[in-house]
């Protein structure tokens, strides 16, 4: 475990034989907003992955903003990274097959922070992160009026109050699937 201090924030890093993880830690006092977070997972475009797309109507406008409200339920698609549908968001966890290794990408410790979606905007081997902006207006709706439906969003992803730690970004590494558990 290592912590790299940058003053107002630090990065905690962990590396083990079975994987790696990192998270940001804020030392800021008072209220502040997180505008965005950037992470990229780079692989060969020919590497294959098991990915769960967000449910998406093929006739809908290819807009990530409409895909942030999801049930996080879908079957996994096995595809080369270069063939990932750039119009669709992917939710974690995913498994990337690289050479003789399997890499499980996920997150943990989500509290008052949006979940991480992945995309392949450029049709290459880079998986980009996407985060839903914080809801501004939420109205009751959906099936049997049981859901909070986001009607508008802020231009930032999180509101924070004082020092805190942020979600872990995790990559587990194994040769066979059972080693990823």
Model-identified regions with their sequence ranges:
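N-terminal accessory beta-strand-rich subdomains and adjacent acidic, glycine-rich linkers
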Residues: 1-181
